[in-house]
């Protein structure tokens, strides 16, 4: 995957992936974050899919400034490249960044991930 422009046009490790919600697939772009325990998406995706995201398992994640952010976890099928698998995806109305976050749980234990910053490439090897 090639890095994508984010805030102010700066290239970041943002990748496309498919997420299945209620038997329908959605294309989502997410920032690959090796410091995030869980994947956390903005709730607009859940609302579009008519998923009551607050029905998920609630947990609180500590963000960079020490504040606890409520996250509602759902086990969803995703497609990353050619691989399809189920992993925990959280939704939070308090996500304080402008992009979805792809975290470690269910992702980093499945792939060898290489960030090639100088070339703007991120690779996933299963």
Model-derived segments and spans:
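Pepsin/retropepsin-fold aspartyl endopeptidases
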Residues: 1-126
């Amino acid at each position: 995957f090639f890095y994508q422009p984010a805030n102010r046009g700066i290239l970041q490790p943002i990748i496309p992936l498919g997420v299945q919600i209620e038997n329908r697939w959605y294309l989502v772009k997410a920032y690959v974050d090796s410091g995030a325990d869980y994947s956390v998406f903005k709730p607009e995706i859940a609302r579009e899919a008519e998923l009551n995201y607050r029905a998920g398992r609630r947990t609180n994640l500590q963000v960079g400034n020490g504040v606890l952010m409520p996250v509602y976890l759902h086990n969803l099928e995703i497609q990353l490249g050619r691989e399809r698998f189920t992993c925990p995806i959280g939704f939070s109305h308090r996500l304080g960044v402008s992009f979805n976050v792809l975290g470690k749980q269910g992702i980093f234990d499945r792939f060898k991930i290489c960030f090639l910053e100088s070339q703007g490439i991120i690779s996933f090897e299963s």
